């Protein structure tokens, strides 16, 4: 586990989730998650720089975050004193309370066993609680184009940015949904956002905010080929 903590600190030292288009992506995912939040409590797993955390804190619900990087934890605690910050690996977290909402934004592509993490999280839900999760989609238009141009060997191959952020895999819609089904959860909603035809670098160089917003919304119409996919899941009724 020490090696995993060291790995997380290394990634945290050069993270780009709060930079450029990545920030817009996280903010749009919050807009989607906000539609489905319920109850009075939220647990966020893997907040990184805390872009999502700041938005979740603004909902007024009691917010706990669990993050394996001490550097990220210290930064969030200093910026958002109302948030309960826990420095722990997900596997070691053992809360006494249960949560109405558990948010995993860009988390499951990082962990060794995503289905096991989802199963852990399911045990921390209130009876009416929900897990809200989002990940990059291997079937995104920009990945399909990269394969055709021979820039990637396969749609689910790790690209330069995946490696930079310590991703262990790139999900497709089927493998993403399977994480929740394997954990015994019921998938209430599957969707996507961010119809992404180009790389972040190309988009940041030429696109206007209006273009970004339009293509974020278009991804909701075409989830199977959107840049990001999401699931809202709950305990079986």
Where is each model-derived feature located?
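A short His-aromatic
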Residues: 106-110
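Conserved N-terminal segment of class I S-adenosyl-L-methionine
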Residues: 1-97, 101-105, 118, 192-195, ...
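S-adenosyl-L-methionine-dependent methyltransferase catalytic module, highlighting the catalytic core
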Residues: 14-21, 51, 112-123, 130-234
């Amino acid at each position: 586990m020490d090696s995993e903590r060291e790995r997380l600190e290394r990634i945290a030292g050069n993270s780009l989730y709060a930079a450029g288009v990545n920030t817009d992506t996280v903010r749009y995912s919050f807009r989607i998650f906000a539609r489905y939040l319920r109850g009075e409590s939220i647990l966020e797993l893997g907040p990184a720089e805390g872009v999502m955390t700041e938005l979740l804190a603004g909902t007024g619900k009691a917010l706990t975050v669990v993050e394996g990087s001490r550097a990220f934890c210290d930064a969030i605690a200093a910026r958002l004193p109302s948030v309960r910050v826990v420095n722990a690996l997900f596997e070691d977290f053992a809360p006494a309370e249960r949560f109405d909402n558990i948010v995993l934004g860009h988390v499951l592509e990082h962990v060794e066993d995503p289905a096991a993490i989802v199963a852990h999280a399911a045990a921390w839900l209130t009876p009416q609680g929900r897990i809200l999760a989002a990940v990059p989609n291997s079937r995104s238009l920009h990945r399909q184009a990269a394969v055709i141009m021979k820039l990637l060997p396969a749609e689910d191959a790790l690209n330069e940015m995946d490696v930079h952020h310590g991703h262990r895999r790139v999900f497709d819609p089927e493998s993403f949904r399977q994480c929740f089904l394997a954990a015994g959860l019921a998938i209430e909603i599957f969707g996507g956002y961010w119809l992404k035809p180009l790389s972040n670098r190309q988009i940041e160089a030429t696109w206007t905010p209006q273009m970004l917003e339009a293509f974020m919304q278009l991804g909701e119409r075409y989830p199977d080929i959107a840049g990001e996919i999401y699931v809202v899941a709950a305990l079986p009724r």
